[in-house]
A protein has these predicted regions:
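N-terminal membrane topogenic signal
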Residues: 2-16
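Hydrophobic alpha-helical transmembrane segments
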Residues: 12-16, 125, 152-157
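Transmembrane-helix signature of polytopic, membrane-embedded enzymes
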Residues: 139-161
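Membrane-interface coil-to-helix junctions
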Residues: 24-138, 157-169
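Hydrophobic alpha-helical transmembrane signal-anchor segments
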Residues: 13-28
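Generic N-terminal initiation segments characterized by hydrophobic and/or small/turn-forming residues
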Residues: 8, 18-21, 101
Length: 169
């Protein structure tokens, strides 16, 4: 391969390629009518919500997503819809303030999506954008070091789709 051609790929072209790669990776779930949430855990593992007999759960390591992040995010979306701001969670104790819930990270940027998007659209967009932003940071870092875009994209994929990162998003 001609190294001169590789070096002529611009940063913006690399970012567009990265956006296409992230969208392509998530396309089967997003365009297939699925959600990027561990709802199989809820349907099989959690009583009294288990609506079907126990079967093999695809990824039991991300149970926090179903037991904590989904309900917290649902409460936040309901608060945005009813109050117009991130306010009160009526589902815990006798009600608690959403900004006090540090596990939820209520000031995190992706929670603001719940204010103007439907719940599952905001949830999926938040996850896609987290992967995109992680890779974008790596692209900018590696490109600032003078590394050609194909290798920069390899670095973005390696960082963004690192197993520990995937498991906790």
């Amino acid at each position: 391969m001609n190294c001169k051609k590789i070096e002529k790929v611009s940063l913006w072209q690399g970012i567009i390629i990265w956006a296409a790669l992230v969208l392509l990776f998530f396309a089967p779930a997003v365009f297939g009518g699925k959600v990027l949430a561990p709802v199989d855990c809820v349907e099989c593992l959690f009583k009294p919500f288990a609506t079907q007999p126990m079967e093999e759960v695809h990824n039991q390591y991300n149970v926090d997503g179903a037991s904590q992040y989904l309900p917290y995010s649902w409460a936040m979306q309901q608060s945005w819809q009813s109050d117009g701001y991130m306010g009160w969670n009526p589902y815990t104790h006798n009600g608690t303030s959403l900004p006090e819930n540090t596990m939820l990270s209520p000031g995190d940027w992706h929670h603001w999506l719940f204010g103007f998007l439907p719940f599952w659209t905001a949830w999926d967009a938040g996850i896609l954008l987290q992967f995109f932003i992680a890779g974008l940071g790596m692209i900018i870092l590696l490109k600032s070091r003078g590394i050609p875009i194909p290798y920069v994209l390899l670095g973005a994929v390696s960082f963004s789709f690192y197993s520990q990162f995937i498991m906790w998003i």
